[in-house]
Amino acid sequence: MNKPTKLFSTLALAAGMTAAAAGGAGTIHAQQPETTVSIDDLYSYPIDSYLVSAEALNVRTKPSASSQKADTLHLGDSLKLISFSNADWAKVKYKNGKTGFVSTHYIVKAATTVKTKTKTKVYTSADGKSIKTLPADTSVSFLGWSKTNKGGFDFDWVFVDYGGTTGYMKTKDLHMTK
């Protein structure tokens, strides 16, 4: 598969999985509390690798669409996540170590492999039924965080892929290290 086709396929797969993870929840901008969550404050997760999923994405100086535009990123550009600011904005590091804010609606998590700590269940959703049980030390692809009904992130649950089956696992059941 050539590089552009592979990149497009990867982005399409990631975008589909992100949409599935959202479960149809609409974004509620006005109801989001003003919270910043640093990745390092949570755990040492392998979650800092993201890709731009839009043709062009503005980098802002503050987490607001009305703040000054600092730069523009393009489809497939990689980002390192520094922190989330609400569910709608992420502080990122991008080309040559620059930092800024981007809308989380136009980035997708780059898949990362993690392992189960113990015998672990995979669920249809964070509050759904169990669809599979995996043994300890099983590798799964970490695709992103579960989302709340209000559009925020639920850091207690992750969206994963195991052998073509996607579902949710409890964060505490996975070895999440950089």
From Swiss-Prot:
Activity regulation, short description: Increases in stationary phase in a strain lacking the WprA protease.
Main location: secreted
Superkingdom to which the source organism belongs: Bacteria
Annotated SH3b domain residues: 47-111, 116-178
GO cellular component: extracellular region
Alphabetical UniProt keywords: Cell wall, Secreted, Signal
Localization of this protein: Secreted, Cell wall
Signal peptide region: 1-30
Signal found in the keyword field: yes
Disulfide bonds: none
Record-linked SUPFAM superfamilies: SH3-domain
Protein's recorded name: Cell wall-binding protein YwsB
Organism annotation: Bacillus subtilis (strain 168)
Lineage, broadest ranks: Bacteria, Bacillati, Bacillota, Bacilli, Bacillales
